[in-house]
Amino acid sequence: MCSQVPFTTGWVPGEPVPGEVVVYFADDPRRLYQLHQWLPVFELLDRAHPVLVVTRHPQTYAEVGRLTRLRRVCVPNLAELVQLYGDGDIKAAIYVNNSVQNFHSLAATRMIHIHVNHGESDKVCMASNQAKAYDRVLVAGEAALRRYREALIEFDERRFVPVGRPQLDLRPEPVLPPTARRTVLYAPTWEGENAANNFTSVDVHGPAIAAAALALPDVRVVYKPHPRVASSTDPGVAAAHRRIVGLVEEAARREPGAGHRVLINDDILAVFRGCSVLITDVSAVGLDFLYLHVDKPLFVADRRNNRAGLNAEAPVSRCADVVDAATVGSLTGTLAKRLARDAYRAEREAMRRYYFGDPAPRESTKRFLEAVEEALAARQTWDRRPLAPSAQAP
């Protein structure tokens, strides 16, 4: 319930709702990272169309207030959500995930519903049949379209709009201080909600990856796992995470000037800056790095030890060195080799175009804003349509 916070900010039932576009986020703060990365983009949208962040959880509501200047409300139950939507003239709702509670909002018939997701990756969850519930689905590029074509029955491509990745137009201040050392970033994903979406390398290869990176001379090693790795309840993941943290912290104590560090809640885009090479899993992190730093080597870990399957399901692995049971033992040498000679630069550039197109700087943001404008115009056209004779009262 939201009894400990105002029902809304700057609005009470019966007064105008302060928003033309809703950003709907129903989950608790553990998933807030999904919304967080979009907030600067939504702040740009707010300049043309007032944006209202609708939350369903009181702690999320409070945290959103610390993250953005956007207006926000907390509506803990369905009756209050229906009242909010009924009292306002909200033209569109935007969704950043596939939360089951999205369907409470999707019941509203006088808004156009836009799904944007919270990243671009080759995880199974990125091509959910839930996409059919939305009027528009904004995707990064051709790879996302292929993913949906292959996964969905009666896929209607007309509702899917490639826009790139607007979040990657942002340039956050770097988290890491300058160093003369080369920086190896290990940024694994979490274990997912089920086995099909479990791509983490933490419990399978994580300690070996950290040890291999730390064995390189003259490097700074940064461990930046997905935030949900640090809070994982999976015994294997939790134990391996503690082991990796211990390895990095022990190396930092032995060599204080090296700059080895563990980062948990920092913006991964800000961590990228200053890194020389990335080791990651099948996740949005690797693709974001590919887009922003196509000139730097990339390693992709495979917990399933199925190279053919990985190459088929995660095409980015074709332009990267793969870390699996067969290669993790020689990882130190492979890292040294890639830092000395980058063998996959041309392949990464081609793969970048496949996933994201070839947008100019800030072009993705422009495409996103144009896609929202088009959706709002479509809604306005629908609103003004004449009723068919059969639908009119006698």
Where on the chain are the PLM-derived regions?
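Catalytic binding pocket for nucleotide-activated donors in carbohydrate/polymer assembly enzymes
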Residues: 284-356
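Active-site and donor-binding regions of nucleotide-sugar-utilizing enzymes
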Residues: 32, 43-44, 50-170
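Conserved catalytic-core segment of nucleotide-activated headgroup transferases in glycan assembly
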Residues: 31-45, 49, 168-247, 360-366, ...
